[in-house]
Design a protein with these regions (language model features):
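Pocket-edge structural micro-motifs
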Residues: 44, 58, 86, 124, ...
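Short, flexible loop segments at the rims of nucleotide/cofactor-binding pockets, characterized by
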Residues: 31-38, 97-102, 129-130
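Catalytic core of membrane glycerolipid acyltransferases/transacylases, capturing the structured
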Residues: 50-109
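Helix-to-loop junction immediately C-terminal to a conserved catalytic motif
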Residues: 21-23, 27-60
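Non-catalytic C-terminal accessory region of glycerolipid acyltransferases
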Residues: 2-25, 111-209
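Residues within well-ordered alpha-helices
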Residues: 29, 93, 109-110, 139
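Short, charged beta->alpha transition segments
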Residues: 43-45, 105-113
Length: 209
């Protein structure tokens, strides 16, 4: 998108903004700048559902690059935006964050996004590289409640490097039932899927700066 088109849409009020504040024009405008900082190579992106809701459970170390890497890699490979929980709900940070796809990490907001058919990136807890961190037992309750696909994703790269690889696993089967034990089983299966991708990523690590 060129700056002229961006400015014209601002003036005439035709810029697209969804219910949660995502501004597609802003995302398109900053995408080239993001590409200068992060080069993302996606492997098996066809495992991300082409339509409908899904939770992309991914690893993180510091958690600075990973949400951007996930969103950029998935969007370039599939054309689908990824919503990122963890937004600080304080203006003006919240306004800018929502324009770029961030959302507040609340069950009602995540459930609403999934019911509307969006992709949501859900980070595991911070841990060492190549290790899947913890995830709260109830974190995937919105996915189970809405029937959303749960897809493990491994992000392989370095905060100081530019090159990242994004490895997408097979969607995790939903357990029977809808109670706390079923949610905990889904969390365990998602973490195991991420860890399996990280364990198999040795070849993908070769050559990373």
């Amino acid at each position: 998108m060129n700056v002229g088109t961006f400015a014209r849409r601002r003036v005439d009020g035709t810029h697209p903004v969804d219910e949660w504040g995502l501004d597609a024009d802003v995302v398109a405008l900053v995408a080239p700048l993001v590409g200068l900082r992060w080069r993302v190579e996606a492997h098996w992106p066809e495992r991300v559902p082409a339509t409908g809701p899904a939770v992309l459970v991914h690893n993180r170390v510091l958690g600075l690059s990973e949400p951007v890497v996930l969103a950029r890699g998935v969007h370039r490979a599939t054309g689908r935006p990824v919503r990122t929980p963890g937004l600080v709900d304080v203006a003006p940070i919240a306004t800018v964050g929502r324009m770029l796809g961030a959302v507040v990490d609340r069950p009602d907001e995540l459930t609403g996004l999934l019911r509307a058919g969006h992709l949501v990136g859900l980070p595991l807890g911070r841990d060492l590289p190549r290790r899947a961190g913890p995830l709260a037992a109830a974190a995937l309750a919105p996915a189970l409640a809405t029937g959303a696909a749960v897809v493990p994703v491994a992000l392989v790269g370095s905060e100081v490097g530019r090159r990242w690889r994004l490895l997408v696993g097979e969607p995790v089967a939903h357990p029977d039932g809808r109670g706390p034990l079923a949610v905990a089983d889904l969390v365990d299966a998602a973490r195991a899927g991420v860890q399996a991708l990280l364990d198999s990523a040795t070849d993908h690590l070769a050559g990373l700066p």
